[in-house]
From Swiss-Prot:
It comes from the Eukaryota. Belongs to the iron/ascorbate-dependent oxidoreductase family. The keyword Oxidoreductase applies. Residues 193-297 form the Fe2OG dioxygenase domain. It holds the Pfam family DIOX_N. This is Naringenin,2-oxoglutarate 3-dioxygenase. It is an enzyme of class 1 (oxidoreductase). GO terms for biological process: flavonoid biosynthetic process. GO terms for molecular function: flavanone 3-dioxygenase activity; L-ascorbic acid binding; metal ion binding. Its EC number is 1.14.11.9. 2-oxoglutarate binds at R288. SUPFAM superfamilies: Clavaminate synthase-like. Pathway: Secondary metabolite biosynthesis; flavonoid biosynthesis.
Length: 377
């Protein structure tokens, strides 16, 4: 099926195209450095078996070490039913296989809360990500707008409800472990989130004609407390812990959840725990599916370190709300992108002027032409 139009181009409609559309091409310094399937086992894998019993202290220590080192780890034996995971991923793939018009019925551009979109819901981005997404605002339950939840494929809404409930329980359990690792009561982090928000984002990364020129999801840190990511076995999630000098591709593990610490979790630990620096790359052979469940504090929740260790100072100047924290983050990111574009445009203009000057300098000097009467004399 051909794309609906340039305004509604869907990456899933791009099969047969040999080149990447310009809106998806990234600057060279942002392009992938490591292949989607060059897997690393550097990210810790932690079994949660016994988390409510004798192994809790051991699990707590391993989670704390992973957050201090990477801000990212994987968990197995987490208690989320394998059949539920299978249903969620199967129905998600069925949705992205629907005709464009069925998906675009739930277009979430223009500030709509939930639904379908290409690349990102963020405004002002200069380059698009090579992905299609469906977003569910699932908690608080009273704020759900089921009119923004796709009706197709049949049964997906009910599965998303069950999935979000199980992920909320797992997230709270993990936040309890993080609270204890900071020397606090088990419920400290959950209480600091007040009435916790949850957002389920289903990412579909189609095959890409030129995967070396783009990203499925640009480099970033998540704004919230923690994120739980379910991914298939294709590979594409990448992480760095040295500011982007070196990247690794996280080894996909069937049924595991990748846990990312977000900016809020970083601030609440007073910087002890890293906010995971990550991105997603794509490939030209197969599509990839991942499902990210973002656990965020309530918009008016107070952002301030819960635990400041002896000899440390708070990493924030003053307490702020999560809404203000998020606003500042988006403002910084967009300002950085704007300044980068301005610098790129300025460099291109300088190069053009230099080329023009070189062309003038290389041109042969004009020779004087004799008058006609002298030529004929």
């Amino acid at each position: 099926m051909a794309p609906v139009s340039n305004e509604t181009f869907l990456p899933t409609e791009a099969w047969g195209e040999a080149t990447l559309r310009p809106s998806f091409v990234r600057d060279e310094d942002e392009r992938p450095k490591v292949a989607h399937d060059r897997f690393s086992d550097a990210v810790p894998l932690i079994s949660l078996h016994g988390i409510d019993g004798a192994r809790r202290a051991q699990i707590r220590d391993r989670v704390a070490a992973a957050c201090e080192d990477w801000g990212i780890f994987q968990v197995i034996d987490h208690g989320v039913d394998a059949d539920l995971i299978a249903d969620m991923t199967r129905l998600a793939r069925e949705f992205f296989a629907l005709p464009a018009e069925d998906k675009l019925r739930y277009d979430m551009s223009g500030g709509k809360k939930g639904g379908f979109i290409v690349s990102s819901h963020l405004q002002g981005e200069a380059v698009q990500d090579w992905r299609e997404i469906v977003t569910y605002f699932s908690y608080p339950v009273k704020a759900r707008d089921y009119g923004r939840w796709p009706e197709k494929p049949a049964g997906w809404c009910a599965v998303v409800e069950r999935y979000s409930e199980r992920l909320m329980g797992l997230s709270c359990n993990l936040m309890g472990v993080l609270s204890e690792a900071m020397g606090l009561e088990t419920e400290a982090l959950a209480k600091a989130c007040v009435d916790m928000d949850q957002k389920v984002v289903v990412n579909f990364y189609p095959r890409c004609p030129q995967p070396d020129l783009t990203l499925g999801l640009k480099r970033h840190t998540d704004p919230g407390t923690i994120t739980l990511l379910l991914q298939d076995l294709v590979g594409g999630l990448q992480a760095t812990r040295d500011g982007g000098k070196n990247w690794i591709t996280v080894q996909p593990i069937s049924g595991a959840f990748v846990v990312n610490l977000g900016d809020h979790g970083h601030f609440m630990s007073n910087g002890r725990f890293k906010n995971a620096d990550h991105q997603a790359v794509v490939n030209g052979e197969s599509s990839r599916l991942s499902i990210a469940t973002f656990q965020n504090p309530a918009p008016d929740a107070r952002v301030w370190p819960l635990a400041v260790r002896e000899g440390e100072e708070p990493i924030l100047e003053e307490p702020i709300t999560f809404t203000e924290m998020y606003r500042r983050k988006m403002e910084r990111d967009l300002d950085l992108a704007k300044r980068k574009k301005q610098a790129k445009d300025q460099l291109m203009q300088q190069q053009l002027q230099l080329q023009q000057q070189q062309a003038v300098a290389a041109a042969p000097m004009p020779t004087a032409t004799k008058p006609l009467n002298e030529i004929l004399a």
